[in-house]
Amino acid sequence: MQKASLTILGCGSAMPTRKNFPSSQLLEIRDKQFLIDCGEGTQIRMCQMGVKANRLGHIFISHLHGDHCFGLMGLISTFGMLNRTAELHIHAQADLEKILKPQLQYFCNDLSFNVIFHTINTRKHELIYEDRSVQVFSIPLKHRVPCCGFLFEEKQRDRHIIREMIDFYGIPTFRIPRIKQGEDFITDEGEVIPNGILTTPSETPKRFAYCSDTAYYEKIIPIIEGVDCLYHEATFMEDEKIRSKQTEHSTARQAGEIALKAGVKKLIIGHYSARYTNQTDLLNEAKAVFENTVLGEDLTTYEI
Amino acid sequence: MQKASLTILGCGSAMPTRKNFPSSQLLEIRDKQFLIDCGEGTQIRMCQMGVKANRLGHIFISHLHGDHCFGLMGLISTFGMLNRTAELHIHAQADLEKILKPQLQYFCNDLSFNVIFHTINTRKHELIYEDRSVQVFSIPLKHRVPCCGFLFEEKQRDRHIIREMIDFYGIPTFRIPRIKQGEDFITDEGEVIPNGILTTPSETPKRFAYCSDTAYYEKIIPIIEGVDCLYHEATFMEDEKIRSKQTEHSTARQAGEIALKAGVKKLIIGHYSARYTNQTDLLNEAKAVFENTVLGEDLTTYEI
């Protein structure tokens, strides 16, 4: 089976540090790439990791704070210089198009590909993207500006056919696709061979949720329930709880609480305030509530 | 004496590489900081080098290609978060204000400081900035879009007074500033003590020229003649001479030729095309013409 993986390009917050670039991550599912947020330096991080973005067609922007979108112009320009031809789709609030279009006209007026904007309603939990193998849903978040997270759901794959059974029952090739989808096989003699004898189930589809930036917000719990991996912001620790409320960010402990209540399998924290030079403290605070927490780090790939 | 120094934050060209960020450098003269170009990631490089930009008041943008200005929004946002209060002056072509203003309004509408735009006429060689210790002149360059380099000239400092002479002639304190500026001293008895006896000359003022991006362009030679340090772009090697002409860039050899003809003291090359993984080849090509050439490198400080 192909694995789903998440590569963190940047998991700092508003101010970059020596370790962390602003928010950006690359999700790879079934040979497709999805970019989630695009802070300054995203294309530089990709270059540092040797990421070829030739399977990247869709970018999802959570909200219009600079640390989540200032890398778009550089990335698009570079795609132009690489003579990209495939359409590039950007999913974001409507304002982004208004801000980027004049810049695209000025700096990239001879682009070799189209940039297509799709408007997200950040207040609604709804399907915003779908292809044959993946669905993406918006997750309304609670932040100072309109903001939403993203739930990526792999679709159920076809069942695995048991090769010996094809031979045993002499199943013709043209029948196989439907059997993989769960159909029984009827022999020439009219005998019904139940699908369960011919196939084994496919892997459980992967689910990944990205929740940044947000205050502690329990309304997301039913949406992200049981995901294989949750990336949740942990800008502050409990020592800065007042500031986290004011700025509508979460503490590491709160990220752990959300993970626990939603029964997720793994939590990755990130979007750390630049004030924390020792991020292990943030990890420990989240782990005290939710054991299977991982410290998000730039230039690192996580299996989902 | 305080030294003048140049810190290269990025000396890559349009496409970043593992080694090089896009164009940006910080010039420090007499305790002031000047930023020259501001490609994507400039603030990240500053952070990586521990540069505090609290003496930075003026930014000079050579031209409006993304790799020379996409870092401005991130830098300005961060200055805002740091509660900067000092005015920030940006010297660039008029179009930059039109492009940045809507972004500033959207992303930084509550900035704690003013951003002031100054228009450069890139076709003219003229004084574009002056304070008590430094003058900056534009240097018209030859590129696909309006573009100019910058000549930074330190002003002549006061002469050094010889302390023993103050005591010997009993020179009152209030006379000292004018003697430092070259005046003779007249004793109470009417004796004229020539300035040359009382003082020694100050250091020769430093001159630095930044020339990027540009085709080989001999018209800059009289302007940059004899500078202590010339940063000249060397996007290509002679093997890509046709491409360098098409794109109006220089080869390393041409950078060396300009340095030689202008009789500069030191040449730093940069703005390397991403195709050259071994930049020593570029250095050697320039050195074959102009021996005192230095390879520009990101995150490196050069004395001027």
Regions found by a protein language model. Give the residues of each.
Chain A
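Metal-dependent catalytic neighborhoods of phosphoester/phosphodiester hydrolases
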Residues: 72-78, 277-285
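General small-molecule cofactor/ligand-binding pocket signal
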Residues: 7, 91, 116-121, 137-139, ...
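Metal-dependent phosphodiesterase/nuclease catalytic metal-binding core
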Residues: 121-269, 280-284, 289
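Active-site neighborhood of divalent metal-dependent phosphoester bond hydrolases
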Residues: 84-88, 93-121
